[in-house]
Amino acid sequence: MTKTIIDQAGATPGAIRTREGLVSAYRTELAIAGAIVLLVLAVGTQVPQAMSWGNFANITQAGAPLIIMSLGVLLVVITGGIDLSVGSVFSLTGMVTAQAMASGLDVSAALIGLGVGLVFGSINGFLVTVAGLAPFVVTLITFAVAGSLAFIVTNGRSMPIGDPDFWLLNSGSLIPGVPNYILFCIVLLVVIEIFLKKMVAGRWFYAVGSSAAAARLLGIPVKRTQFFAYVASSLLASFSGLLTISYILNAESTAGSSLMLQAIAAVVIGGASLLGGTGTAVGAVLGALMITVIQNGVNLIGINSFWQGSVTGLAILIAVLIDRFSKSRRGAV
């Protein structure tokens, strides 16, 4: 009985995939992939440069930080929570790492940067699971605190990265011919997708998001699952920040100001519900790629960049309406 309820908590659990097939299980993700292709083709008719390999490389390079951050946000959203602090954690990580390197540390300063994510993720998890505060309130507070600290570290000044070897974290190649930023995205995608869909602990995330009370009755460690989700979200936000500063070799206190909205948008566009209980890593990655393609297209066509926020907001609205419509149809059936 326990396994049945946990299986029902996920949108496309393993048993359903086996029965209906891979295409049926990932039909939402396939639709998003198709939409991305259509977007690229549409922009390509206006700007042939959009179809070049160089532009595709730019899209993956620009999208990697958002992809990684979105995978972390996905874990929280599946459990029925929300993490508004990821953009500020992203910024603070960059500032702290840059300051540590300016103080004489080598690339090992990246560990201090990851420590920022660990600390803020633990604070979020503790306040949500132990103190019982609402995720929106908790992460709004840590969003403000981390954002403020990002300014305080250097009095709002940007910080250059003094060690050029730090660039290798992003653009080096642990595997010949494959840039690290692509490798990291692929590895995280595979690991998180397998964790969510094939491991018992991953199924707990869906169960908690579907009904925390029911999950608790089944003996699922609800608080531990939620705590892990917030820690993972902040750690991935920090890692995303490290990848960014290692590419541009500069840290800015406002670098992640727009990424929080984009990460949540990517998760929702990818098929996750803000009510919890559904979502896939594949969907989150495709959602992030769609946002990046839209931004890239806006720039290539020459549309005012200030419209990007409006386009992102519209994409969220459409995704939420589609999610609501699909749920109402399933309820009617």
Swiss-Prot record:
Coiled coil: none annotated. It is a multi-pass membrane protein. Keywords: Cell inner membrane, Cell membrane, Membrane, Plasmid, Sugar transport, Transmembrane, Transmembrane helix, Transport. Its main location: membrane. It comes from the Bacteria. One of its GO terms (cellular component) is plasma membrane. One of its GO terms (molecular function) is transmembrane transporter activity. It is found in: Cell inner membrane. The chain crosses the membrane at residues 30-50, 62-82, 84-104, 110-130, 133-153, 175-195, 228-248, 253-273, 274-294, 300-320. Belongs to the binding-protein-dependent transport system permease family. AraH/RbsC subfamily. PANTHER family: ABC TRANSPORTER PERMEASE PROTEIN YPHD-RELATED-RELATED, RIBOSE IMPORT PERMEASE PROTEIN RBSC. Probably part of the binding-protein-dependent transport system y4mIJK. This system probably transports a sugar. Probably responsible for the translocation of the substrate across the membrane. This is Probable ABC transporter permease protein y4mJ. It comes from Sinorhizobium fredii (strain NBRC 101917 / NGR234). The lineage of its organism: Bacteria, Pseudomonadati, Pseudomonadota, Alphaproteobacteria, Hyphomicrobiales.
